[in-house]
Amino acid sequence: MNVLVINSGSSSIKYQLIDMTTEKALCSGLVERIGEGMGKLTHKIKPDTDAEEKIVLEQAFANHVEGMKKVVDLITDADKGVIADKGEIYAVGHRVLLGGEEIKQSVKIDEWAKGIIRDYIPLGPLHNPANLAGIEVAEELFPHAPSVGVFDTEFHQTMPKKAYLYPLPYDLYKTLRIRRYGFHGTSHRYITKKTAEFLGKPLDELNIITCHLGNGCSMAAVKNGRCVDTTMGITPLEGLMMGTRCGDIDPALVPFLMEKKGWSGAEIDTVMNKQSGLKGICGMNDMRDIHAAREKGDEMAELAFQMFVYRIRKYIGSFAVVVGKLDAIVFTAGIGENDDLVRAAVCKDMDILGIDIDEAVNAKRSGQARHIGKPGQRVPVLVVPTNEELEIAQTTVAVLNGKN
């Protein structure tokens, strides 16, 4: 049984074809610069294995349909294909940003679901239209294969009202659905399940803090296996300092910047989403570049690093109180899985929480879930690799089998 996972962006399609009998990717890839002149398709056969083979094509893709048609050509190619024909695709799982309160769990896509995704375009103007485009492409090219929407906000639907409401006039919530939704939910859910397995603890008894740290960053407080709070809000801008996003700020800065700089709301949104965070402080948004600059004595790179770490530490303290008895703190995603310097700085001097990491163990690289704390520490610190595509594929199968 093969499931095609699609993450459709405004000018891109990220995809992965997964064999659900082995839960391994047969192929994966990225179509870029759709509708922008010369496009690019990077296709990997047997990705992340010793037998990986990469194919790179440069050609124009007028729209998402053209891009996906080329992907189909590659995956069914007589010589390099991984399946004989597209009929071998059982289902298509879609990453969807925002389903609001109406869609509380993953659903088989129908006209009602598409209508809800469309209704939330004002709150997800970049992602929801692109997600719809991906769904429509799948419906056109794979009419035999049902589509399932797996929502970024789904895992956070268990937050209590006291956590997800903003202290604004309540009528704004009722009329405009202004509330905290949270994102990266697919990753947080996958990590929560994997942590329960790793610790040998029932999911409904698990209390953890998950730290998804990449170019985009978020954390979740998980109590009894359910999300009770998260750092992102009505958009992915709230919360931690990120690669190019500012995270938490005083909202009064918006009218202040309008007055002092003459910026429009759209211009301020661009600054806060694309020119702030690590990039705004030191001009770099890749943590590897920041570490290299720190080693050379770059004070702004050091400041950006310290600010990034400080926000994470502050939220760990906050969420520890929310969760109560902690079973683990879990790091995942690009920085969380691979950057021992960030993990060490985050966990430094956290005796009050019973955290004490082993520097030598922390510095070792591994693609497996692992402990990085010293033996006997009160709260384990774990690194657990995420796999959002597999989570989407597994959820897709569960939905179609009526088990979600």
Swiss-Prot record:
<keyword id="KW-0418">Kinase</keyword>
<comment type="pathway">
    <text>Metabolic intermediate biosynthesis; acetyl-CoA biosynthesis; acetyl-CoA from acetate: step 1/2.</text>
</comment>
<keyword id="KW-0479">Metal-binding</keyword>
<feature type="site" description="Transition state stabilizer">
    <location>
        <position position="184"/>
    </location>
</feature>
<feature type="site" description="Transition state stabilizer">
    <location>
        <position position="245"/>
    </location>
</feature>
<dbReference type="InterPro" id="IPR000890">
    <property type="entry name" value="Aliphatic_acid_kin_short-chain"/>
</dbReference>
<feature type="binding site">
    <location>
        <begin position="212"/>
        <end position="216"/>
    </location>
    <ligand>
        <name>ATP</name>
    </ligand>
</feature>
<feature type="binding site">
    <location>
        <position position="388"/>
    </location>
    <ligand>
        <name>Mg(2+)</name>
    </ligand>
</feature>
<dbReference type="Pfam" id="PF00871">
    <property type="entry name" value="Acetate_kinase"/>
</dbReference>
<dbReference type="GO" id="GO:0008776">
    <property type="term" value="F:acetate kinase activity"/>
</dbReference>
<dbReference type="GO" id="GO:0006085">
    <property type="term" value="P:acetyl-CoA biosynthetic process"/>
</dbReference>
<comment type="similarity">
    <text>Belongs to the acetokinase family.</text>
</comment>
<feature type="active site" description="Proton donor/acceptor">
    <location>
        <position position="152"/>
    </location>
</feature>
<keyword id="KW-0547">Nucleotide-binding</keyword>
<dbReference type="GO" id="GO:0006083">
    <property type="term" value="P:acetate metabolic process"/>
</dbReference>
<feature type="binding site">
    <location>
        <position position="7"/>
    </location>
    <ligand>
        <name>Mg(2+)</name>
    </ligand>
</feature>
<keyword id="KW-0808">Transferase</keyword>
<feature type="binding site">
    <location>
        <begin position="286"/>
        <end position="288"/>
    </location>
    <ligand>
        <name>ATP</name>
    </ligand>
</feature>
<feature type="binding site">
    <location>
        <position position="95"/>
    </location>
    <ligand>
        <name>substrate</name>
    </ligand>
</feature>
<comment type="function">
    <text>Catalyzes the formation of acetyl phosphate from acetate and ATP. Can also catalyze the reverse reaction.</text>
</comment>
<comment type="subunit">
    <text>Homodimer.</text>
</comment>
<dbReference type="GO" id="GO:0000287">
    <property type="term" value="F:magnesium ion binding"/>
</dbReference>
<keyword id="KW-0460">Magnesium</keyword>
<dbReference type="GO" id="GO:0005524">
    <property type="term" value="F:ATP binding"/>
</dbReference>
<feature type="binding site">
    <location>
        <begin position="334"/>
        <end position="338"/>
    </location>
    <ligand>
        <name>ATP</name>
    </ligand>
</feature>
<feature type="binding site">
    <location>
        <position position="14"/>
    </location>
    <ligand>
        <name>ATP</name>
    </ligand>
</feature>
<keyword id="KW-0067">ATP-binding</keyword>
<dbReference type="InterPro" id="IPR004372">
    <property type="entry name" value="Ac/propionate_kinase"/>
</dbReference>
<dbReference type="InterPro" id="IPR043129">
    <property type="entry name" value="ATPase_NBD"/>
</dbReference>
<keyword id="KW-0963">Cytoplasm</keyword>
<dbReference type="GO" id="GO:0005737">
    <property type="term" value="C:cytoplasm"/>
</dbReference>
<dbReference type="InterPro" id="IPR023865">
    <property type="entry name" value="Aliphatic_acid_kinase_CS"/>
</dbReference>
<protein>
    <recommendedName>
        <fullName>Acetate kinase</fullName>
        <ecNumber>2.7.2.1</ecNumber>
    </recommendedName>
</protein>
